[in-house]
């Protein structure tokens, strides 16, 4: 049974502000990686699951720095490979460095002779002559949280250094100053965990299906939130990129479901407003992370069926850094859902024989 005071997931979530502070005291690894990657013409970022979500955020961060960057799933990178050019670079993201296709992706990159960087946790099994950037200590919980934020922090540091090396001083400064703001904003958000607990308790009490939706750099925040809810609480949850949600999935949303949009200042706001107004016609319960995208949608938030978890950050924070903030209430939600349902947020369900045996049928 998960207890929000003792679960590994809960402790990792609350350790994230200090972890980011500590990572920002160390720029050696990101600087070394940037010096190598600055010599490339294109960069692939590979990962699986939560690490793929980090890789996707990394793509947006590197693009902000002026890099031709592409996030790919490690499975696809290894088994359905795109041709690599000699001036390509590859970044492989992995929590523990032990996953089958993450290692195959790394091996392919090294064997191809391209510049390769690994981003992984301390004590990782990731090996090789390539540059390895460490993030945080290995997590107790199999529902990863702090290693995700750690990987995104490292990717943002690499992006900042790449921007500086290419003469994009404005972008480099925006990333560095933005990163410095994050720990304090994170702490303020985590101090409001009771707001999240209320949402979780209501969702469990009414058996709500959960639909998470994000766009741009937060296009993976929705799927990441859904993944955490499934891993921790074994609930029915789906995560969508905003436009994908509009093109079909929304017709399955019911009035008693919970829609969880992630909306920050950026190019997707007007389209998010369209989604929210459509959702208001259906009558689904809504818990928005961020800010209402328009005056018309702001009027919907009555504190009853429509709730808002606001994030107070400076107007000059790049949108590309917001996934480090928007994921926090979704991580808390996963742990509180587990508590309300009486599940083990940390075990990956290996404490149940059927699921433990299922896990023996394949190597991850």
Model-identified regions with their sequence ranges:
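Alpha-helical transmembrane segments of integral membrane proteins
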Residues: 46, 214-217, 321, 325
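Active-site phosphate/pyrophosphate-binding segments
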Residues: 4-42, 132-258, 268, 341-364
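Peripheral docking tails and interdomain loops at the edges
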Residues: 312-364
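Short N-terminal signal/transit or membrane-insertion segments
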Residues: 20, 75, 319-320
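Glycine-rich phosphate-binding loops that contact phosphosugars or nucleotide phosphates
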Residues: 27-29, 35-182, 215, 258, ...
């Amino acid at each position: 049974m998960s207890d929000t005071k003792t679960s590994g997931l809960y402790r990792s979530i609350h350790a994230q502000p200090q972890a980011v502070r500590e990572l920002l005291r160390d720029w050696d690894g990101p600087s070394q990686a940037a010096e190598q990657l600055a010599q490339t013409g294109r960069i692939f970022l590979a990962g699986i699951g939560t690490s793929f979500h980090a890789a996707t955020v990394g793509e947006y961060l590197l693009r902000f720095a002026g890099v031709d960057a592409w996030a790919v799933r490690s499975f696809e990178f290894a088994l359905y490979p795109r041709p690599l050019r000699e001036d390509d670079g590859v970044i492989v993201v992995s929590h523990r460095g032990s996953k089958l296709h993450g290692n195959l992706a790394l091996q392919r990159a090294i064997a191809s002779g391209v510049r390769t960087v690994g981003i992984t946790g301390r004590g990782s099994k990731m090996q090789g002559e390539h540059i390895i950037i460490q993030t945080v200590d290995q997590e107790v919980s199999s529902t990863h949280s702090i290693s995700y934020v750690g990987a995104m922090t490292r990717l943002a540091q690499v992006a900042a250094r790449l921007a500086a090396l290419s003469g994009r001083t404005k972008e480099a400064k925006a990333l560095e100053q933005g990163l410095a703001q994050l720990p304090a904003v994170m702490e303020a958000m985590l101090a409001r965990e009771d707001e999240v607990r209320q949402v979780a308790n209501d969702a469990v009490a009414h058996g709500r299906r959960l639909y998470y939706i994000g766009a741009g750099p937060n296009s993976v925040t929705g799927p990441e939130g859904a993944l955490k809810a499934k891993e921790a609480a074994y609930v029915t949850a789906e995560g969508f990129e905003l436009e994908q949600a509009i093109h079909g999935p929304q017709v399955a949303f019911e009035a008693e479901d919970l829609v969880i949009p992630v909306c920050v200042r950026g190019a997707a706001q007007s389209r998010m407003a369209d989604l929210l107004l459509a959702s208001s016609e259906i009558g689904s319960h809504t818990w928005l992370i961020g800010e209402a995208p328009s005056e018309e949608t702001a009027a919907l938030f009555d504190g009853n069926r429509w709730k808002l978890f606001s994030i107070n950050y400076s107007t000059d924070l790049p949108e590309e850094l917001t996934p480090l903030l928007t994921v926090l209430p979704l991580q808390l939600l996963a742990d509180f859902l587990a508590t309300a349902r009486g599940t083990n947020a940390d075990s990956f369900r290996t404490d149940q024989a059927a699921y433990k045996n299922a896990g023996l049928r394949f190597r991850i």
